[in-house]
């Protein structure tokens, strides 16, 4: 076996493990580094999750180098942001027909 021989490693349940890690980070309120402000509420999140899941948030965060930025969402309801974050972190969101529009 030569030192230049390469091995292929696979993490069989990678997607499930990452999804569970995202859920745990949010549920346990670990390492939050961004706040979204709407309807007089502050919702904590992770810049890496917002950036990976949304070009909108990625652009905002790229333009704001602050270690813990506040993103003000005027005209957006708390429940809407909560639904979006649930979708980003969990891959699912429960919405009423009215909320879909």
Residue ranges: model-predicted function:
Residues 1-8:
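Cytosolic, low-complexity regulatory segments enriched in Ser/Pro/Gly with interspersed Lys/Arg
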Residues 3, 14-101:
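Canonical BTB/POZ domain core
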């Amino acid at each position: 076996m030569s030192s230049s021989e390469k091995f292929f490693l696979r993490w069989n349940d990678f997607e499930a493990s990452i999804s569970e890690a995202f859920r745990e980070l949010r549920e346990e309120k670990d390492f939050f580094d961004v706040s979204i402000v709407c309807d007089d509420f502050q919702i904590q999140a992770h810049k890496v999750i917002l950036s990976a899941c949304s070009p909108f948030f990625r652009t905002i965060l790229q333009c704001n180098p602050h270690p813990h930025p506040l993103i003000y969402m005027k005209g957006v309801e708390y429940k809407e942001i909560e639904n979006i974050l649930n979708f980003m972190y969990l891959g699912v969101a429960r919405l009423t027909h009215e909320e879909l529009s």
